[in-house]
Amino acid sequence: MKQLSFILCLAGIVLSACTVGKQEDLKGIAEELCQYVPDHQLLERSRDYMTDDFYALLDTMFNLPEHEAMDHEWLYYFVTGNGGTIADFSVDTVEMKDATHAIALLTVRQMWEDSTYTDDEDAEEHRLYMEKVDGKWLMSDFDEHKQDCIRHIAIWRKEEAQRQAISDYLAKEIGRDYLQGEVCIPVLMLVATEDDSDDEARIWGDFWVFNYNLVGDTLKTVSGGNHSGCMYLAKDGDKLRVTRFEQTEDGAGNEESAKRIFGSHYDVYQGMHSNEDVREAVRQEQLRQYIQANDLQATCYQDYGWDAVKL
C-alpha cells in the first residue's frame, strides 16, 4: 500500500513538472510572438507567426485607403501611443483553453530609446491569443482586435459605396455644368451620416467638383466649385445612387440655407468649410487615391495662377 502511494505521489510530481514545463515553453513562445504584435505597422514577416485569417484581416486593415488623415488611427496604437516609446512586453501567465488554444496575459510598459521606462502607471495589461496549427503555435488574435477589424472593414466598405455614389453624382450631374476637362475628380468632406434604413441614408458634406487636364505630370485645374449640402442615397439594385441633393444657396442666402440644411451639424460643417488648410489636405489625399486607382501619370496638381503642388 505504501509502495502504491509512493508511485502515485511520484506520478503526481512528474505530471506537475510536465505541466510547469509546458507552461514555461508556452511562455517562451508567447514572448517570441510578442515581437510581431502590430505597432504602427504590420511587418511582412509577421505572416509566419500569425494564423492565416488573423494576418489577412490585419493586412486588409493596414492597406485600406484613407480618405482623410488617420482614418484608421486606432490600428497604430495596439500597444503604444504616439510619444516615441517602444513597447516592452512581459508574459505573466499562459492559460491553456484546450489542446490547441491558449491565452497569454501580458504586461506592456513603455520604454524610451535610452532603455529607461515611463511612469509605472503607464503599464497596461493585454491578451495575446494563441492557436496551434500544424504543430506550431501562432498568434490568432490580440485583445479581441479580430472582431474590431471585421466590424471596421464592413463599415469601411459601406462608407466606400456611399462615397462612390456621391462621387459619381458630382462628376456626372454637377461636373457637367462646368467647363469640361479630361477628368473630373470630386473632393468629399463628410460632415455627418444618418442611415434611415439598410438601403437608405442621408449624408451631409462639404462637396467640391474639380475638372482637370493632364499636362505632362501635372493635373491643371480647368474649372471647379463648391456644392455643400445633404445627399439622399438609396439602393438601386446592387448599387447605391443619389436620389436627391439639397444644396446650400449661393450669395446672400448661403448662411441661412446652410443652417437649415445642416441643422445640428452646422457648426461642424462651418468649421470644416472655412478651413482652407484642411480642405487642401483632404483634396491632396483624395487626388493621390484617384491617381493610384486610375493609374494616372501625375505627380502634382496646379490651380490657375498658383504654383504646382507636389502630391
Please provide the spans of the model-predicted regions.
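C-terminal motif of bacterial Sec signal peptides marking the signal peptidase cleavage site
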Residues: 15-17
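Short, aromatic-enriched amphipathic alpha-helices that serve as compact interaction elements
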Residues: 22-49, 158-174
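Low-complexity, intrinsically disordered terminal/linker segments enriched in charged
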Residues: 38, 99-134, 138-160, 243-311
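Short, well-ordered alpha-helical segments enriched in acidic and aromatic residues
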Residues: 41-69
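Hydrophobic/aromatic beta-strand elements that line small-molecule binding cavities or substrate pockets
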Residues: 91-93, 125-132, 186-194, 228-233
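N-terminal "first-domain core" detector
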Residues: 155-193
